Regions:
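Amphipathic, small/basic residue-rich leader segments at the start of a protein or domain
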Residues: 1-124
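Glycine-rich phosphate/cofactor-binding loops in nucleotide/flavin-utilizing enzymes
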Residues: 386-443
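Generic structural signal for well-ordered, non-transmembrane alpha-helical segments
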Residues: 48-51, 289-292, 296, 326-333, ...
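Glycine-rich beta->alpha junctions and the first turn(s) of the following alpha-helix
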Residues: 224, 232-332
């Protein structure tokens, strides 16, 4: 048995002496125990295309923040490479990729810019809405070959405050306010939640609305994720939505569970909780990519900047910087390991025709929320080491930290509420009636 793993040879020391300090290690720590068996050729292709676009994504990030949305040019590029088809059914021109593909694509986008990752989150809603009744789906995909951007965006779909809908012949009269409609400028349809009434019956539903029926408020002024295009959409006067564009949330589990009999592709083999867990995977994979992108810039800047104190020629030569680099890398790799493990598990359960329990989902949600926070902690550590130069708006590294804080404020990602929800399961207490990382069950 060789001792090379534990004892460095003179050759090792000679080789190390020839390496420049602070070189960025591109090869990630191994994170998969299944050898990436759920990664598809199409998923790899899209990931590689995004990597090629990364310089453009980063170059446009500051302007996108000022405009409140990604540029038309970038949206067109994402459309060209097939980003907005990733979770659509093959039968309607989509790719129907599984959770591992989704995770890798989201991570690659996050390395460039968080809001670019968020536009993919918007597009991934096709996984759910494609399971709705056929007439709605036919209308949704009518422009799939010509539309530039995501086919659908959504606002306040599961929120406590939504729109209203009252029954009329052949449809519904709808009005209301739908907040956080991410991607609304580039979407062909807008989905929104409604409290509906039909005589003595009432409940929660979703409606597919034409953007022309809505007014967009210029209210997306935030400290991070400014380019996510998350304006509020309103309709102060009632407008008509046909029956075909209305979905009763009571039927949501039945719709999602029917997907495997309607469509091919791994995305549609996942059942209700597996589908919802995939959204959580996507969310946190964006954060992992952001932390990896932040690390790239951290290494670059640490090797090109002089510290305020102590008197080293470069920030990278400070012991505290070296410790921070090691800790940050370990935090990011640990987060990636957890999320990819869940992605692979979701795909495995989907191929076996099973689903997860409520307890499985709640624990998975808190695990992924926790490692999402770990990514933010790693980014904060790197920013702190770089000092005041890292908070200048002209320095792109600061955007990762700001965007990370806003993402983790999302209701489906907040650590403490998710901990309480999971804790009730773990302690054997009666669980809350919730699903999808803490959303109220509105069925």
């Amino acid at each position: 048995m060789t001792t090379r793993a534990t004892h460095a040879t003179q050759g090792d020391h000679e080789m190390a002496a020839t390496l420049p300090p602070g070189i960025l290690i591109e090869q990630p720590t191994p994170t998969s125990t299944v050898f990436d068996r759920y990664l598809s050729a199409e998923g790899r292709r899209i990931g590689a295309a995004i990597a090629e676009l990364r310089p453009t994504i980063r170059a446009q990030a500051a302007q996108a923040e000022q405009q409140g949305r990604l540029s038309d040019e970038l949206i067109a590029e994402f459309t060209r490479i097939g980003l907005y088809r990733v979770t659509g059914p093959v039968e309607y021109g989509g790719l129907a990729l599984g959770a591992r593909d989704v995770a890798e694509i989201a991570r690659e986008l996050g390395r460039g810019d968080a809001s670019a990752g968020w536009t993919f989150l918007v597009a991934s809603s096709l996984r759910m809405v494609s399971t709705f009744p056929k007439e709605l789906v036919e209308d949704l995909y009518r422009a799939v070959d010509t539309w530039q951007g995501p086919l659908a965006a959504g606002g306040s779909t599961f929120a406590a405050v939504t729109g209203t809908a009252r029954r009329v012949p052949r449809g519904w009269m709808v009005k209301g306010k739908w907040s956080f409609a991410s991607g609304n400028h580039h979407a062909n349809w807008i989905f929104g939640g409604v409290q509906w009434t039909d005589g003595d019956d009432s409940g929660h539903g979703l409606v597919m609305m034409e953007p022309s029926d809505l007014t967009r408020l210029d209210d997306w002024s935030v400290s991070g994720m400014s380019a996510s295009d998350s304006n509020t959409m309103v309709a102060t006067e009632e407008f008509f939505v046909p029956d075909a564009h209305f979905v009763n949330m009571r039927d949501l589990p039945l719709h999602i569970d029917s997907a495997s009999s309607r469509y091919g592709g791994l995305a549609y083999q996942a059942k209700v909780r597996g589908s919802m867990m995939t959204v959580m995977v996507l969310n946190v994979a964006i954060l992992i990519g952001m932390a990896q992108g932040c690390f790239e810039l951290f290494v670059e800047q640490a090797n090109s900047r002089k510290p305020f104190s102590p008197p080293y020629p470069l920030v990278a030569e400070m012991a505290s910087t070296q410790v921070a680099a090691g800790k940050a890398r370990a935090m990011i790799d640990a987060a990636e390991t957890v999320v990819l493990r869940y992605a692979d598990w979701i795909d495995q359960v989907a191929t076996e025709g099973g689903d997860f329990t409520a307890a499985d989902e709640s624990v998975a949600s808190i695990d992924m929320s926790y490692v999402g926070q770990l990514c933010l902690d790693a980014m904060d550590l790197m920013l702190r080491i770089l000092g005041s130069s890292a908070v200048s708006l002209s320095n792109p590294i600061q955007r990762f930290g700001r965007d990370g804080r806003v993402i983790l404020s999302h209701g489906a990602l907040r650590l403490e509420p998710l901990s309480e929800i999971a804790g009730r399961h773990l302690l054997g207490l009666p669980p809350f009636d919730m699903f999808a990382a803490g959303l109220q069950n509105k069925a």
